[in-house]
Every structure is written in structure tokens, then in C-alpha cells.
């Protein structure tokens, strides 16, 4: 059985200036701050912003490359309990030691063949 990805859950983005980025997305799209200082094991100023169906996880990297960078993107997965076995079956690299537990959800992080990190989450938007 395949993993059943339902939606793109969120986009995790490196930004040069956190305050400027939050202002941009608030002013242009009406996004609100869903979580202040991100408590997600990231050693950089960060926030989660968005609306009911879109979440952007922004963290500040002032000296990042001019073209920007997406740290990872997330899929909400219907059959979460099958992720580890399915990844092992296909030889997919599992990151961070397996299941990562958050306040309201849990995730498994994997690496695609091009080196992009994907977060496979149990609950849409991490329950935020």
C-alpha cells in the first residue's frame, strides 16, 4: 500500500529578515501569526504564519543565498502509522531518528533523491 498524501501541509522557509517577511505575508495575504517564536528545535528567530488552510514556517537566516531557500515542505499523510515501514521498504532516508513529537502532532522527516527534506505529518498544520 502507498502512503496517502492528502495535501501540502506547510512550507518551511528560510528568510533574510523575519519581521519584513511576516509583514509582507500579513499585508499581502492577511496571514496571521499562528505561533510566535517557533519552539521547533530551530536555532534561529522564527514564526509560523498563515490562515486556516496555509501555514508558512519562517525562520531567519540573515546571510542566506540571494535566491532564498526552502528548508522543507510537509505533506499531511492519512496512514501515518505506515510511514516508517514504507520508507524502510523503499530505502528512503529517515531523518532525526524517526518520529518527532510535537505539542499537538507528530511527524517523520525524510529526504528525497535530490536532497529535499519532506515532513510527513499526522495532523494538518500540526494542530495549530
Q: What is each residue range found by the language model?
A:
Residues 1-19, 71-73, 124-128:
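N-terminal beta-strand motif that seeds the catalytic metal site of vicinal oxygen chelate
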Residues 4-7, 65-69, 101-102:
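Short glycine-enriched loop/turn motifs at secondary-structure junctions
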Residues 9, 43-45, 71, 104-106:
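Residue-level marker for the onset of beta-strands and adjacent loop->beta junctions
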Residues 12, 32-40, 97-101, 123-128:
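Conserved catalytic-core motifs of GNAT/GCN5-like acyltransferases
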Residues 12-55:
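Core segments of cupin and vicinal oxygen chelate
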Residues 18, 73-117:
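Vicinal oxygen chelate
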Residues 52-55, 63-64, 80-81:
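Short, charged/polar surface micro-motifs in flexible loops or helix N-caps
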Residues 57-59, 109, 119:
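Conserved beta-strand in the GNAT
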Amino acid at each position: 500500500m502507498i502512503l496517502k498524501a492528502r495535501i501540502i501541509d506547510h512550507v518551511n522557509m528560510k528568510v533574510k529578515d523575519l519581521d519584513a517577511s511576516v509583514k509582507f505575508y500579513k499585508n499581502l495575504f492577511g496571514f496571521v501569526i499562528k505561533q510566535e517564536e517557533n519552539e521547533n528545535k530551530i536555532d534561529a528567530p522564527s514564526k509560523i504564519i498563515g490562515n486556516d488552510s496555509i501555514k508558512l514556517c519562517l525562520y531567519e537566516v540573515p546571510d542566506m543565498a540571494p535566491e532564498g531557500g526552502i528548508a522543507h515542505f510537509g505533506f499531511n499523510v492519512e496512514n501515518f502509522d505506515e510511514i516508517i515501514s514504507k520508507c524502510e521498504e523503499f530505502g528512503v532516508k529517515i531523518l532525526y531518528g524517526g518520529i518527532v513529537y510535537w505539542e499537538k502532532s507528530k511527524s517523520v522527516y525524510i529526504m528525497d533523491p535530490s536532497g529535499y527534506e519532506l515532513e510527513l505529518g499526522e495532523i494538518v498544520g500540526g494542530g495549530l
